[in-house]
Amino acid sequence: MIKKRRTNRYTEVYAIAQYISMSAHKARRVIDQIRGRSYAETLIILELMPYRACYPILKLVYSAAANANHNMRFNEANLIISKAEVNEGNTVKKLKPRARGRGYPIKRPTCHITIVLKDLDVEEEYLDSFAFEDKYIHKK
């Protein structure tokens, strides 16, 4: 499987959790609440929401922030969640033994969660550098 990323590598950092053992519908219920919010506000929301999906998403947001801090030297106070998506994963199928030699199927859905964090200060500097370049260098 080839994963293509069309993110700006200078202003965005992402983290992916695959094969999380819950349905994508239940994870989307939580992801929709945090999309577009700041990092600090997201942590508060995830700690106070009463859903089972909050814990793996909270771990993923922590991981994305650690990636941003360690790899790109971003400040956690300036991070926002620019993209958050949930996709369906494989369905784990089992058979539960029943009476008279029968077997009932058990379907356990999984999902893949992607969190993309963006640093607002770095993005402004990045866009300003292009504005300078367009204004002075590419002018004929």
Curated annotation (Swiss-Prot):
Give the similarity note: Belongs to the universal ribosomal protein uL22 family.
Job of this protein: This protein binds specifically to 23S rRNA.
| Annotated organism of origin | Morus indica (Mulberry)
Protein origin, superkingdom:
Eukaryota
**Which subcellular locations apply to this protein?**
Plastid, Chloroplast
Provide this UniProt record's keywords sorted from A to Z. Answer: Chloroplast, Plastid, Ribonucleoprotein, Ribosomal protein, RNA-binding, rRNA-binding
Q: Name one GO molecular function term.
A: structural constituent of ribosome
Subunit note: Part of the 50S ribosomal subunit.
Q: Would you tell me the protein name for this molecule?
A: Large ribosomal subunit protein uL22c
Q: Does the keyword Kinase apply?
A: no
The protein's matches in InterPro entries, at most eight in alphabetical order, are given as: Ribosomal_uL22, Ribosomal_uL22_bac/chlpt-type, Ribosomal_uL22_bac/org-type, Ribosomal_uL22_CS, Ribosomal_uL22_sf
**One biological-process term from Gene Ontology?**
translation
Any one annotated GO CC term = large ribosomal subunit
Q: Which SUPFAM superfamilies match?
A: Ribosomal protein L22
